[in-house]
Every structure is written in C-alpha cells, then in structure tokens.
Regions:
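A structural micro-motif
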Residues: 1, 26, 71, 131-133
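Conserved alpha/beta core of the MobA/IspD/sugar-nucleotide pyrophosphorylase nucleotidyltransferase superfamily
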Residues: 85-162
Length: 162
C-alpha cells in the first residue's frame, strides 16, 4: 500500500488522481475513497480485469450500470434503473492497464480535468471493446459506496448488521 499526494485534489477531478498513481496501475485494485468495505473481498487474485458491482436500494439516483454480454462488461450507462451498478472497486490486469495507460494523455487537457462530471472510469469506458473486463457482484453487506449523508447513515446500519 502506498499513499500518494495529489496537490490538485480540490481543483481537478479524479482523472488527475488516477494520473498521479499511473505508475502503480496494473495487476492492481483501484478503490474509490468513498467506499466502505465491511468484509474482506480481496480473497484470491482475479484472473481478468473486473468491476465489483452492488445492487443499491431503489432510488431515483443515477448510477453507472454495466451492460453485460457473455459474462463481460460490454458498455456502461448512467441510469436510475434498479440493476447492479459499479461499486467503486475494480481490478485491472497488466495487459488491460497498459491499454488504459495508452489513452490517459487524451484526458489530461485542463478543460477535461476541471469537468466534475468526468471520472477516471471514463478512460476504460471509451475502450471497453479492447479490454477484457468481467464483473463480480457483491452484497451491500460486503461493501457500500457513500455519496451523501443519507448513504453514510445507511452504511452505518449495514455495518451494525454484519
């Protein structure tokens, strides 16, 4: 584990944070800082790149929903459909990481880094057809992503049930 300093975390979106960690990317997990993990989900090394998914409680909030074809993530859409969505944890093989690294320069323009609607996941999303990305669905009792005070309180209730 290595902690990296992002001196521009207040100014730029997390694409810049990803850029700061690019030398550590590959055969590695990426865990967004707003994810709470209740159980050890890191048992065994995945054979392919994958996104961890959860099914959140029904709401009108839009989430990143993977479109799955033949056990692989074919596309990712933003929707409030009640379906499994990206959790904020992923694993990337060395070969897929190298392909993503080849595209990061396209995302380093200041106007892109200042766009709060973009995330580092936008990079692999653009080249999913060139990647081998599977998925692993978890229970909300395994991990949860916190984006609001309401979700924080919900996560506390989940933790007390574990």
């Amino acid at each position: 584990c290595k902690i990296l300093n992002n001196e521009k975390y207040k100014e730029f979106n997390n694409i810049y944070s990803f850029y700061k960690a690019i030398n550590h990317f590959g055969d590695s997990f990426v865990i967004d800082s707003d994810v709470v993990i209740f159980k050890n989900i890191f048992i065994g090394r995945p054979k392919t790149s994958l996104y961890f998914l959860i099914t959140r409680p029904k709401s009108n909030k839009e989430e990143w929903i993977p479109i799955i074809k033949k056990d692989k993530i074919d596309n990712i859409i933003v929707s409030n459909d009640y379906l499994p969505s990206l959790l904020g944890i992923s694993y990337w093989s060395k070969s897929d990481a190298e392909k993503i690294k080849e595209h990061i320069h396209k995302f380093m323009a200041k106007n892109i880094l200042l766009d709060n609607s973009l995330y580092w996941d936008n990079i692999p999303m653009q080249i999913l057809s060139d990647l081998n990305v599977g998925y692993k669905e978890l229970s909300i009792h395994d991990a949860y992503e916190i984006d609001s005070i309401e979700e924080y309180h919900f996560a506390l209730t989940l933790n007390h049930k574990n």
